[in-house]
Amino acid sequence: MTASRSPATDLPKSWDPPAAEYAIYRQWVDAGYFTANPASDKPGYSIVLPPPNVTGSLHMGHALEHTMMDALTRRKRMQGYEVLWQPGMDHAGIATQSVVEKQLAVDGKTKEDFGRELFIEKVWDWKRESGGAIGGQMRRLGDGVDWSRDRFTMDEGLSRAVRTIFKRLYDAGLIYRAERLVNWSPVLQTALSDIEVNYEEVEGELVSFRYGSLDDSGPHIVVATTRVETMLGDTAIAVHPDDERYRHLVGSSLPHPFVDRQLLIVADEHVDPEFGTGAVKVTPAHDPNDFEIGLRHQLPMISIMDTRGRIADTGTQFDGMDRFAARVAVREALAAQGRIVEEKRPYLHSVGHSERSGEPIEPRLSLQWWVRVESLAKAAGDAVRNGDTVIHPTSMEPRWFAWVDDMHDWCVSRQLWWGHRIPIWYGPNGEQRCVGPDETPPEGWEQDPDVLDTWFSSALWPFSTLGWPEKTPELEKFYPTSVLVTGYDILFFWVARMMMFGTFVGDDDAITLDGRRGPQVPFTDVFLHGLIRDESGRKMSKSKGNVIDPLDWVDMFGADALRFTLARGASPGGDLAIGEDHVRASRNFCTKLFNATRYALLNGAQLAELPPLDELTDADRWILGRLEEVRAEVDSAFDNYEFSRACESLYHFAWDEFCDWYVELAKTQLAEGITHTTAVLATTLDTLLRLLHPVIPFITEALWQALTGNESLVIADWPRSSGIDLDQVATQRITDMQKLVTEVRRFRSDQGLADRQKVPARLAGVTESDLDTQVSAVTSLAWLTDAGPDFRPSASVEVRLRGGTVVVELDTSGSIDVAAERRRLEKDLAAAHKELASTTAKLANEDFLAKAPPHVVDKIRDRQRLAQEESERINARLAVLQ
């Protein structure tokens, strides 16, 4: 933009990420680059940010997800799309209410001391004071979201959407109230969703006891359970219909030892006749499998616990006991009657625990509100079957269909105060009415006290954030959203629910634009990423102590380094293992790019029209041809959400080809007065920085502005085909030159010659190998000088190339300090031995081999092999120096 500017002075001598990144991000936001305009005539591209919990902070999984979404939106913006990346946060019902209740408890208060309305005001106060941490973290990562549209799932607009769809589902008969089994938290006093339950292996006891006769003289059946207290609610005993041992008992009954109740013996396919005694106790009100058996056989469903997990209403001596105390008391009472057959302690089994409060959840029969999912799940499944929504990778499709084709009705009510209040009102005589957003409840009626599951409102996120149920320009421009980026671990919990609700309202006038387009799905693509694991391949968890705060790495290495590490490891559906060494390597990559650009600018790199191809050097034609190949590779990778492939291609081109070779060759060309070299340097850097920008936006912005003087990479054009094909003849010459230089450098290293120490040399076979044009490059990059009249070769290197063999004769006499070289080699040998011992010990550790993922073991084996080769090479060199 400014002809008189001095690009080299626009850059500091080194890159300081913390200071530079903050200033650059502020410039982007102030310039409005991320603000979406629904009135634009550009094609629309939109992504909704999976809303993080308002109580939380961004973890490494968020950082991965945000990096990929930011990369996609930045690229599309550069490709000429009107881009909306919609930010927002989830109200996180249970988590948020728990945080505020804990704050009240510090002062000895409970939410009941304030009442519902005052307590909710306190939650809003907390949200306003403490709910902004995530926004700051997103800015540190470089998220290019439209902050002007930041949403919250409890905003009035989103609340209206919740009430609207609830009313429509209710009127369609798809929401109903019923007593069914739920995950119940006795501590939180509410039902929980499946995702709020963590399963942990615990040591318990397996108690086998007899129903019926105490000896073998009369009818009896032995059953086993880890929750013996639930036998107070048993209403049947189930056996397999083909089990000959019990066939004569099916249809009869056995008495309950503590209550006046007969237990019906039923035949059910669910029972595994090979497991245990082949008979199971059936407690329909306290076990999911038993509940299904109870429905099939129309069994009584007797709840034996109150909401706090205490035995209640059984009419036994156990009433009032905590469930765990009752477990001991019931076992002792059975033993006193002589009914205990066997007790296994410890017995390791999986038990569901409340994610938030930590206690074992209690499957419990409870009166709740439910969504009838059969037709909704079918529509969600059909959207993928019909290709309206494409799941990436396609290998995840079977899991998707297995879930949506066998989905159970969804419990959507929660016994909380914080959340979307269920819009059902009750009259004085038991009347019930669903009140829509534009309706007024009758005078004197009372609203249902429960709130909706957090997942209910987040299921509306793709269209509620765009203004639904109103008709808005945003819905017209940006809906359906282009892609959903999320973890495969919540494919069913969140993605399926968004698909169900999205297809349910897909033919709504606000979405079809009054019929101007057909029914829509919430997103065109679903990209599922894997989980972040530590460098040993273990899942990150607080209990393992291996959780890493992404901002710690941002502070240490910069946001670009973290982003490149995550994107480079991200393949569709695959988990990625990362450690500090990976981020340090990415930081080094950024430094390499910075130094190469700074060198180019200091040497006059400037964008200009390139001369005809036949006037370019072999090196020029090679780097420009490779650049075009990499551009096409990166485009293909991004189009298929293959972030790892894109980053690997860019990394190896930038480091191995451009920085390590072309920049060095450019120095030779500039020394020879080849003036167009500066234009080739600038052209290559210009395209490379544009291609890298979606993943490492900060450093590329600074470098590109210094290179071009233009406003911002954010709004620059994405590279298009240059039309420059890879020149095969030039490429072969460069390949041969690289091999020749590499072999000479390896020989020099083995001889103990210092880098850049000039050595007289004579080359033979150059013309026959078609390398006449590369002699100056070989001489410069291999640190050789011309052989003088007194040249006496002391060594030679033969390098077989495609067109022939080049012999390099060298005079190394007097160039080596033998004693110093021995000291250096001995030091290197000690390091190689240490690495060899370390890797060998790891590979001999059976526990490590059993637990570590295959790719981690392979890396250790590679390190062991390299250490062995290095040790052998050094020993050979030491032998020569004897």
Curated annotation (Swiss-Prot):
One of its GO terms (cellular component) is cytosol. Residues 816-882 form a coiled coil. A motif ('KMSKS' region) lies at residues 539-543. Its EC number is 6.1.1.9. ATP binds at residue 542. GO terms for biological process: valyl-tRNA aminoacylation. It is an enzyme of class 6 (ligase). A motif ('HIGH' region) lies at residues 52-62. Keywords: Aminoacyl-tRNA synthetase, ATP-binding, Coiled coil, Cytoplasm, Ligase, Nucleotide-binding, Protein biosynthesis. GO terms for molecular function: aminoacyl-tRNA deacylase activity; ATP binding; valine-tRNA ligase activity. It catalyses: tRNA(Val) + L-valine + ATP = L-valyl-tRNA(Val) + AMP + diphosphate. Pfam families: Anticodon_1, tRNA-synt_1, Val_tRNA-synt_C. InterPro entries: aa-tRNA-synth_I_CS, aa-tRNA-synth_Ia, Anticodon_Ia_Val, M/V/L/I-tRNA-synth_anticd-bd, Rossmann-like_a/b/a_fold, tRNA-bd_arm, tRNAsynth_Ia_anticodon-bd, Val-tRNA_synth_C_sf. It is found in: Cytoplasm. It comes from the Bacteria. CDD domains: Anticodon_Ia_Val, ValRS_core. Monomer. Belongs to the class-I aminoacyl-tRNA synthetase family. ValS type 1 subfamily. NCBIfam families: PRK05729.1 (NF004349), valS (TIGR00422). ValRS has two distinct active sites: one for aminoacylation and one for editing. The misactivated threonine is translocated from the active site to the editing site. Catalyzes the attachment of valine to tRNA(Val). As ValRS can inadvertently accommodate and process structurally similar amino acids such as threonine, to avoid such errors, it has a 'posttransfer' editing activity that hydrolyzes mischarged Thr-tRNA(Val) in a tRNA-dependent manner. HAMAP family: Val_tRNA_synth_type1 (MF_02004). This is Valine--tRNA ligase. It comes from Mycolicibacterium paratuberculosis (strain ATCC BAA-968 / K-10) (Mycobacterium paratuberculosis). The gene is valS.
